């Protein structure tokens, strides 16, 4: 009986992964307005009933898609935190590489996350996910730039640079983004040429780096 139950759970998880991959692709390629149960069913090549079973309402589907995109961006963030812990003095270049990856390898996920940021303005339930996005990056930057206020300023500027780089006319210019981000963070360094304090350690094993229910 346990094996049967485990098998069903695994199939259910695989199906949700399939549906959310399709949902994120729709949002990233066509915009939030294109995200419907029927569109996900068609993109995932499953029945409409399968989508509504896992995500009964449009809000359920939208929030799950945003969290899924955020979790995949979170894997990139975990890479960033790990590298920063190993090479704290190289943080500007590491962040430059991170943002370049967001607009290339993780372009669709990143667009979906920005759709979430905009949607959070009128959907309070998305607020915690948005705030976690900003808080985790700011915590990483604080030791380098010297204060929480400066870290949140840099975080907001990074979001603006990434958003600009996502525009179609900038899609083939990740190198310019990398340089701009590295330069921005160097300009905000608390003590130019001085030592860099210890950075935020990687999240504990088992903690999802972008899970809105996990502590900041």
Describe the role of every protein-language-model region.
Residues 77-110, 154, 178:
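Hydrophobic alpha-helical connector segments
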Residues 74, 103-114, 119-153, 179-183:
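Amphipathic alpha-helical packing segments from all-alpha helical-bundle domains
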Residues 126-127, 131, 144-210, 216:
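Hydrophobic/aromatic-rich alpha-helical bundle segments in the mid-to-C-terminal region
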Residues 18, 22-30, 76-83, 112, ...:
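Solvent-exposed, amphipathic alpha-helical segments
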Residues 18, 22-60, 64:
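Helix-turn-helix
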């Amino acid at each position: 009986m346990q094996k049967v139950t485990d098998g069903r759970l695994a199939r259910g998880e695989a199906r949700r992964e399939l549906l959310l991959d399709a949902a994120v692709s729709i949002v990233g390629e066509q915009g939030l307005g294109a995200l419907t149960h029927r569109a996900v069913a068609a993109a995932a090549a499953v029945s409409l009933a399968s989508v509504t079973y896992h995500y009964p309402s449009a809000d359920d589907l939208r929030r799950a898609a945003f969290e899924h995109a955020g979790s995949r961006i979170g894997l990139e963030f975990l890479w960033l935190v790990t590298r920063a812990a190993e090479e704290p003095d190289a943080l500007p270049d590491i962040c430059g590489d991170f943002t370049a990856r967001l607009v290339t390898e993780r372009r669709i996920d990143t667009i979906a996350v920005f759709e979430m940021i905009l949607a959070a303005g009128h959907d309070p339930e998305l607020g915690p996910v948005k705030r976690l996005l900003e808080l985790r990056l700011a915590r990483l930057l604080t030791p380098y730039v010297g204060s929480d206020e400066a870290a949140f300023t840099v975080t907001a500027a990074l979001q603006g640079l990434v958003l600009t780089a996502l525009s179609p006319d900038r899609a083939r210019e990740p190198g310019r983004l990398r340089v701009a981000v590295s330069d921005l963070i160097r300009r905000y360094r608390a003590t130019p040429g001085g030592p860099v304090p210890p950075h935020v350690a990687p999240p504990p094993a088992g903690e999802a780096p972008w899970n809105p229910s996990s502590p900041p």
